[in-house]
């Protein structure tokens, strides 16, 4: 059993265009402000990492995230992970040049898994995060979705995670579509199932879980689950 030192909390900023947004189940997205101002606020409050996700880049092939990351990286001096619409080496390189420390990939790599290996070879596995948007579609079965929870992939999240790890990802971001934005607590069944997979396969990889936190007491439900390193809120 791996000994848990502490759970890290990192702010998750979901972006649409030039705005920070929030929604429920990754739907019904509403604007709540400027990503730059919120990033600076979280940094001033002691955040030691930021997760920034462009929620429409994969749908519309938008790449305005570069300028947003560039501005944030000049004001916020902690590691920044960026996801959304990363289709190739060029997109990834532009994010790194504009201040990203890690990138989170999802839609493009479900269609072209070899891209994971190409990114890991070019930038290092430690900088590649596999973003898995999980939705329950049967008893003890979760499917990986893409395009902010809109599109089926037909991929079992366990099989997909194992393939991603084999191809070279250095970290996993596991988001519960069913619980995201609901503030009703974490999807414990999903997280425990994923933790069991890591344990059974003897896989040691940083795991970020996201979706559902509504109060600090919700963290108590996670503390005794192995392999969780970080909570994105």
Name each model-derived stretch.
Residues 4, 15-17, 21-22, 26, ...:
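Conserved anion-binding
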Residues 9-13, 22, 50-52, 80-84, ...:
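Hydrophobic faces of well-ordered beta-strands that scaffold small-molecule active sites
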Residues 14, 42, 50, 82, ...:
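Conserved, mostly hydrophobic/aromatic
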Residues 19-63:
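N-terminal beta-alpha supersecondary unit
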Residues 30-43, 87-94, 152-163, 219:
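Short, acidic/polar
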């Amino acid at each position: 059993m791996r000994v848990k030192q502490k759970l890290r909390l990192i702010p998750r900023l979901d972006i649409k265009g030039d705005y920070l947004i929030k929604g429920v189940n990754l739907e019904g997205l509403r604007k709540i402000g400027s990503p730059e101002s919120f990033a600076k606020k979280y940094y001033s409050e002691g955040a030691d990492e930021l997760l920034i996700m462009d929620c429409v880049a994969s749908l519309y092939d938008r790449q305005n995230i570069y300028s947003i990351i560039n501005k944030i990286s000049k004001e916020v001096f902690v590691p920044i992970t960026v996801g959304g619409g990363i289709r190739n080496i060029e997109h990834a390189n532009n994010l790194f040049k504009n201040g990203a420390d890690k990138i989170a990939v999802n839609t493009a790599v479900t269609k072209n898994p070899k891209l994971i290996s190409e990114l890991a070879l070019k930038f290092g596995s430690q900088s590649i995060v596999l973003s898995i948007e999980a939705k329950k579609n049967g008893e003890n079965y979760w499917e990986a979705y893409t395009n902010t929870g809109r599109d089926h992939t037909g991929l079992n999240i366990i099989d997909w995670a194992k393939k991603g790890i084999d191809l070279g990802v250095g970290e996993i971001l596991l988001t519960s579509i069913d619980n995201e934005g609901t503030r009703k607590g974490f999807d414990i069944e999903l997280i425990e199932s994923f933790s069991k997979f890591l344990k059974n396969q003897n896989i040691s990889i940083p795991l970020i879980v996201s979706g559902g936190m509504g109060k600090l007491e919700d963290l108590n439900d996670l503390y005794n689950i192995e392999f969780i390193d970080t909570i994105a809120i």
